[in-house]
Amino acid sequence: MEIPLSRYQSIRLDEIRDSSSNPKVLTFPRKFSLRGRRWKNPFGRLSCSSVVQGLKPKPKLKPEPIRIEVKESKDQILDDTQISKSGVTICSQIEKLVLCNRFREAFELFEILEIRCSFKVGVSTYDALVEACIRLKSIRCVKRVYGFMMSNGFEPEQYMMNRILLMHVKCGMIIDARRLFDEIPERNLYSYYSIISGFVNFGNYVEAFELFKMMWEELSDCETHTFAVMLRASAGLGSIYVGKQLHVCALKLGVVDNTFVSCGLIDMYSKCGDIEDARCAFECMPEKTTVAWNNVIAGYALHGYSEEALCLLYDMRDSGVSIDQFTLSIMIRISTKLAKLELTKQAHASLIRNGFESEIVANTALVDFYSKWGRVDTARYVFDKLPRKNIISWNALMGGYANHGRGTDAVKLFEKMIAANVAPNHVTFLAVLSACAYSGLSEQGWEIFLSMSEVHGIKPRAMHYACMIELLGRDGLLDEAIAFIRRAPLKTTVNMWAALLNACRMQENLELGRVVAEKLYGMGPEKLGNYVVMYNMYNSMGKTAEAAGVLETLESKGLSMMPACTWVEVGDQTHSFLSGDRFDSYNETVKRQIYQKVDELMEEISEYGYSEEEQHLLPDVDEKEEERVGRYHSEKLAIAYGLVNTPEWNPLQITQNHRICKNCHKVVEFISLVTGREMVVRDASRFHHFKEGKCSCGGYW
């Protein structure tokens, strides 16, 4: 019998009808015999919707033949007019389609096999269909293929049993995979590797170790890839004790020099916090691969050894080992920690030079860096160039808009993400709600907050409530903010009360601020930032005695306020400044130049209407010290140095380790107006973009 293949090439199974016949539902047996052992079907009763609904081929006016170019094979694939429409031909076409990575077209032909159950299908065709399921990661396809195998009485050999097991693992059907694994009569190392790697990938590390123990008892052997997977499980558990036991086993079996095992050891020790042993495992490798370099560099960066990680990165470059997108993403993360914009520009150039401009991992790291370091427009450019975007990419850019006070852009990006059918998560809502809070977008903020549970089925967490409290505080609705905290259907957290305390500071509500501060002090652990907010509140309102009391409390608790420090990057060098004249690393000529520039700026902005506010320091500070420290805050010194040493057309960016004080915020607004320079200040709270005398924060931070 001949089957018109061209009719089915682009027709979905559910679109095929036949009004002349209406066959009954086909049911497949739950078990079939396999070498004397029963192979259980985890899916039970399966049916084909086309058989249920009947069959009716839908002809096409201009059928297009299948044309496939296979370089590896000299056999030509013939069109519909040249081939005999037999089951063997269909199977051959399916195998060649899979070989050419045309998996969906292969399943369109597979529908014909499902309809004509009389066709005999060989092992190679089943193997091709399994490969298509793995590549598509489609649970529906897995059920169809596995059900078809059972209905045709297919009895797989060990190779195909392992392939079927791998198909279930790769498609996320881990429970069914375990059931199939238990039914395999003769399990080998590959069987164990497939199921163990599946449980590790799903984060079920305890089950993975149980299977590893079972494998050792049954086979008394272990494959090197399985060792590497188990080291990853140890890292997931955070158990260096278990990891060291695996290390000893690898030494006894003589597989410790294997590349996969060595890289697994480096990764395990790094993630468990033992960076010295990670470095030792790295140095013991006979041949250091790109993955090994990436693992050890990432380990140093993960534990805060950014300078050492950067040195290793240069060593990797000098060793001649090729870099990949993961190397560049690590390089960008190190740049973020060290605030080195020039280093990131080098990484960006390397991405383009090495052909990684479309790779999602490194480019998402770029979006994150540019967002965090004041280059949000550049971040958007990189984001738009990405051919594929994951949820991390969307969240990184949205968070960048939030930190830079561009709430409207963040909301538009959120709407665009929803329109693109990308499901938001908790981080997404935190980013967009923070953007609304920073920009004072009350209406949009409340609409998005309510949509979390009502539309997207995501229960708001404490951090989302903190954003809404900040939004209420920005509008001066402090009583409503307290009521909102009390009505929250979850345990109140430090972040929620801290948002209210900051609102009290900005609204200068000292009485409520004291109450909230006492609440925070009793919640523990002690958080220095809350004391700093109270200190600033007292200080800005002239309550010097109360401010001194806050410092005494800090001292009694063993806490201390770090001195205000500001950094500015000029070229590839980072320059730091403390308030007053405490920057001994500069010679007297540079110091005089900086002071002179500050004095000139203060004089210029005074002509534009700026008047110096009275500075309130502690009672034991004399007037001269008060005047000197107040006039030469670290922000002003850094700006003066940057203005002198950078081109006029470049935006000036500085970084502060505290919240920028009210007076300095006002000064920078006037300086941006007088000099015509765009200035970006990153303080402990957020980014402040100063342009033409205005700040992106709108006076609320």
UniProtKB/Swiss-Prot annotation:
Residues 607-701 are annotated as: Type DYW motif. Keywords: Chloroplast, Plastid, Repeat, Transit peptide. It is found in: Plastid, Chloroplast. Belongs to the PPR family. PCMP-H subfamily. PPR repeats lie at residues 86-116, 122-156, 157-187, 188-218, 223-257, 258-288, 289-323, 324-358, 359-389, 390-424, 425-460, 461-491. It comes from Arabidopsis thaliana (Mouse-ear cress). Residues 572-606 are annotated as: Type E(+) motif. GO terms for molecular function: RNA binding; zinc ion binding. One of its GO terms (cellular component) is chloroplast. Residues 1-47 form a transit peptide. Residues 496-571 are annotated as: Type E motif. This is Pentatricopeptide repeat-containing protein At5g50390, chloroplastic.
